[in-house]
Amino acid sequence: MMFPQSRHSGSSHLPQQLKFTTSDSCDRIKDEFQLLQAQYHSLKLECDKLASEKSEMQRHYVMYYEMSYGLNIEMHKQAEIVKRLNGICAQVLPYLSQEHQQQVLGAIERAKQVTAPELNSIIRQQLQAHQLSQLQALALPLTPLPVGLQPPSLPAVSAGTGLLSLSALGSQTHLSKEDKNGHDGDTHQEDDGEKSD
């Protein structure tokens, strides 16, 4: 008689224990789900940030690649110009007197010895002149600037863009000299024509 009662009493405690562990497990699962959801949200934000940085890096890579390609083209162009000018100097040099030949050779050797500080100074002067011309074109009031200080309205210039600007300025100067020489040649031809008349 006692055996069935003890078995019945033991079975009556099982649903309460089972109910308690199920509720506790659900709470733990809910907490873990919320934690995982917060981690997922944080990782998603970080992934979006990395994707944005990746696209920005790709944009910078394309920009630097184009700049590098342009500098490479400009370097080959300047090397070809130097080679042609050296050829012209070599052709003209024998027609000079011995004294003038030595002077010209010395001047050519001195011209080849360009130091980095001299190059930086030349680039800085060219950029300042270019920026002043831009300010004058915009009709902005000009105030004297300390050495090395750039106008606030103009973006900061990096070394690569500085070289590109310098090369662009050099090409403009070269073109203006060619135009001037061509104009002088036209005036000489007109003078010769008037003299022949």
Curated annotation (Swiss-Prot):
Keyword Ubl conjugation on entry: yes
The UniProt record lists the keyword Transmembrane: no
Pfam families in the cross-refs: TLE_N (PF03920)
Keywords associated with the record: Nucleus, Phosphoprotein, Repressor, Transcription, Transcription regulation, Ubl conjugation, Wnt signaling pathway
Expression across tissues: Ubiquitously expressed in developing embryos by midgestation, a wide expression is conserved in adult. In mouse, abundantly expressed in muscle, heart and brain.
Region listing for CCN domain, in residue ranges: 166-197
GO molecular function: transcription corepressor activity
Modification after translation, per record: Ubiquitinated by XIAP/BIRC4.
GO cellular component, one term: nucleoplasm
Location of this chain's protein in the cell: Nucleus
Disulphide-bonded residues: none
Biased composition (Basic and acidic residues): 175-197
GO biological process: negative regulation of canonical Wnt signaling pathway; negative regulation of DNA-templated transcription; negative regulation of gene expression; negative regulation of response to cytokine stimulus; negative regulation of transcription by RNA polymerase II; positive regulation of anoikis; regulation of growth; regulation of transcription by RNA polymerase II
Notes on the domains: Lacks the C-terminal WD repeats.
Assembly mode: Homooligomer and heterooligomer with other family members. Binds TCF7 and the NF-kappa-B subunit RELA. Interacts with PHF12. Interacts (via Q domain) with SIX3. Interacts with SIX6.
Family membership: Belongs to the WD repeat Groucho/TLE family.
Known function: Transcriptional corepressor. Acts as a dominant repressor towards other family members. Inhibits NF-kappa-B-regulated gene expression. May be required for the initiation and maintenance of the differentiated state. Essential for the transcriptional repressor activity of SIX3 during retina and lens development.
Name this protein carries in UniProt: TLE family member 5
Taxonomic source organism: Mus musculus (Mouse)
The gene coding this protein: Tle5
